[in-house]
């Protein structure tokens, strides 16, 4: 569940930003470097991949190195492709946190960014270029896995860095690198 929840949480961020801000792009496409610090490990784990989000196709998260993993979520549901190549369909009715994520994204795509406040305490801090948004999960499925999420963006719909602190003590930083046009 934890591996699915974190990419899905990223979808929470990109969907409302794209839906709410008129000048935001209708699509977000980026490469990323993910650095994960785990209690008990002397060095962080680093992976590389691509992330895409658009209203028509939904959310796509692919780790390309050092292993292959894909998480996809759209109007038809969600699935993951594991490193061994097996594909698993995820049913929101059987996965409460996924149902919550899908609800937030559907509302965000209809232009309701305020729905984030139903699931998170939201604090927005203006920066010289862009803003930082701190999301602290309210009581519920997400609060069982995530302590908080901090998003730094350069412009509306353009996250540069997402920092995720997990209840297990894990910490993940995801730095986005814009894809070539």
PLM segments and residue spans:
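Positively charged n-region of N-terminal signal peptides that target proteins for export
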Residues: 1-3
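N-terminal signal peptide c-region/cleavage motif recognized by signal peptidases
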Residues: 13-16
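Flexible, processing/modification-adjacent segments and terminal tails
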Residues: 20-37, 41-44, 81-138
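Short beta-strands and strand-coil junctions in structured, solvent-facing domains, enriched
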Residues: 38-39, 67-69, 141-142
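Amphipathic hydrophobic-ligand
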Residues: 43-49, 148, 170
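Extended lipid/amphipathic-ligand handling interfaces
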Residues: 49-53, 151-154
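An acidic-aromatic
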Residues: 50-103, 172
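Gly/Pro-enriched, hydrophobic low-complexity segments
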Residues: 113, 117-119, 126-181
């Amino acid at each position: 569940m934890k591996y699915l929840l974190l990419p899905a949480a990223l979808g929470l961020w990109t969907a409302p930003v794209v839906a709410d801000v008129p000048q935001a792009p209708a699509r977000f496409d980026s490469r990323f470097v993910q650095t994960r610090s785990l209690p008990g490990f002397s060095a962080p784990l680093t992976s590389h991949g691509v992330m895409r989000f658009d209203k028509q196709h939904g959310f796509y998260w692919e780790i390309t190195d050092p292993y292959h993993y894909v998480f996809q979520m759209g109007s038809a549901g969600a699935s993951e492709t594991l490193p061994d190549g097996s594909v698993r369909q995820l049913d929101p009715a059987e996965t409460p946190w996924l149902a919550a994520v899908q609800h937030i994204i559907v509302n965000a795509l209809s232009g309701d960014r305020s729905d984030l406040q139903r699931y998170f305490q939201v604090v927005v801090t203006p920066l010289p270029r862009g803003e930082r948004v701190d999301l602290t999960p309210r009581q519920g499925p997400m609060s069982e896995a995530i302590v908080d999420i901090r998003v730094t963006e350069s412009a509306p719909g353009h996250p540069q860095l997402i920092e995720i602190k997990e209840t297990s003590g894990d910490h993940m930083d995801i730095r986005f690198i814009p894809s070539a046009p």
